[in-house]
Design a protein with these regions (language model features):
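Glycine-rich cofactor phosphate-binding loops and adjacent beta1-alpha1 units
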Residues: 159-161, 201, 206-281, 334
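C-terminal capping/lid region of NAD(P)-dependent oxidoreductase domains
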Residues: 162, 194, 228, 258, ...
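Residues in the short beta-alpha loop(s) of Rossmann-like NAD(P)-binding domains
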Residues: 9, 196, 263, 290, ...
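NAD(P)H dinucleotide-binding glycine-rich loop of Rossmann-like/cofactor-binding domains
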Residues: 89-170
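Glycine-rich beta-strand-centered segment in the early N-terminal region that forms part
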Residues: 21-35, 48-93, 133-135
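Short glycine-centered segments of the SAM/dcSAM-binding site in methyltransferase folds
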Residues: 80, 166, 255-256, 283
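C-terminal substrate-binding/catalytic core of Rossmann-like NAD(P)-dependent dehydrogenases/reductases
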Residues: 220, 224, 228, 265-315, ...
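Mid-domain Rossmann-like dinucleotide-binding core that forms the NAD(H)/NADP(H) cofactor-binding site
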Residues: 80, 134-217, 221
């Protein structure tokens, strides 16, 4: 099969012919229909993700069609499925408690095992998989493996966002736009922050109530001004110190900060404003992924027409364009996200 392989950090991925993956007894092999290109892939590509090593096939945000099914998988050839990027064991204390995204023995295609920048992907532990809803395009569904589901869990489980609350979002990449779309569906009043004017205009077009250019003045002060004293919930969607502190500082008393952006490599340790946390009685939440059992709560909204995540997709690209898309994350990016939909090109 054709795959794009990381051979050297910060260099073009190698397009190579490699053997098709084998199928585990509790898993499936999928023909990849679409795979999102995510900032988390970029962390691996530049060498800052601690588990991504040369030789890795990236790609953790995908959907596909079953071409081979293990005897214990519960799926059939021809089924079209969505996969969460965390494949939980189902039996450890975290899994038994419902927090399978904290599984002690999680498997991670795209980070540790071969991912979906390829024509086929082996997916073990198929109890984590969910059927692709009829009528949902694969390029849209791919985001349900990471960015959209991560945003959904961050807002509904970690932050417990309520209708009428102010939601601030720092960064309007894929996860930030997902939080915008989902936050609106939950009835929140959304304020977005970025440094790219085109992305701010794009977010306003998707329904943000206000858009703040982080290059122009004190971000937290300006958010407090447009949110009647501060956001109730603030999402940091980049993983860097400046936006983490802006997110904390923009909150009203008893506000909730959610760390969605991934702090790795040189951003793994950050200095944050603990005084603001103490004085305003703030709550800080970490979040990563979503337990697979929560898929119906999100897919129900999508199926009912209450949520449309298609506007996230800015462009469909061939596998050969993955390197260029990863390189684009080195600086401010254009609005929307890229999805690989052609694995022969």
């Amino acid at each position: 099969m054709r795959a794009a392989i990381l051979r050297e950090y910060n260099a073009d991925l190698n397009l190579e012919e490699v053997p098709e993956p084998g199928c585990e007894k509790d898993g499936v092999v999928l023909k990849v229909l679409a795979c999102g290109i995510c900032r988390s892939d970029w962390h691996g590509w530049v060498g800052e993700h601690p588990r991504v090593k040369p030789g890795q096939i990236l790609g953790h945000e995908y959907c596909g069609e079953v071409v081979e099914s293990g005897p214990e998988s519960g799926w059939q050839v021809g089924d079209r499925l969505i996969a969460p990027f965390i494949l939980a064991c189902g039996s450890c204390p975290s899994c038994r408690s419902g927090a399978s995204n904290n599984c002690a023995d999680q498997r991670l295609p795209g980070f540790v095992e071969p991912g979906a920048y390829a024509e086929f992907i082996a997916v073990p532990r198929a109890h984590n998989l969910t059927r692709l809803p009829e009528g949902l395009a694969p390029v849209t569904a791919a985001g349900l493996g990471c960015r959209v589901t991560t945003a959904w869990h961050a807002l509904t489980d970690r932050a417990a966002l309520k209708g009428g609350e102010f939601l601030a979002i720092h960064g309007t990449g894929g996860i930030g736009l997902s939080c915008l779309i989902l936050g609106q569906a939950l009835g929140a009043r959304v304020v977005v922050v970025d440094v790219v004017a085109e992305k701010l205009e794009h977010a306003l077009g998707l329904g943000a109530e206000a858009a703040i250019d982080a290059r122009k003045g004190d971000v937290a002060e300006r958010i407090r001004a447009v949110t009647e004293g501060g956001a109730h919930v603030s999402v940091e969607a980049l993983g860097i110190e400046a936006t983490t502190n802006a997110s904390i500082d923009c909150l009203r008393p008893l506000g909730r900060h959610v760390q969605v952006g991934m702090p790795v490599g040189h951003t793994a340790f950050q200095t944050i404003n603990m005084s603001a946390i103490y004085l305003k009685n703030l709550a800080l939440f970490g979040t990563r992924g979503m337990p697979a059992w929560r898929y119906p709560s999100l897919l129900g909204l999508i199926g009912a027409g209450r949520v449309d995540v298609a506007p996230l997709i800015a462009r469909q690209v061939p596998l050969s364009a993955a390197s260029a898309e990863l390189r684009a994350f080195n600086g401010p990016t254009a609005p929307g996200v890229a999805v690989i939909s052609d694995f022969a090109g």
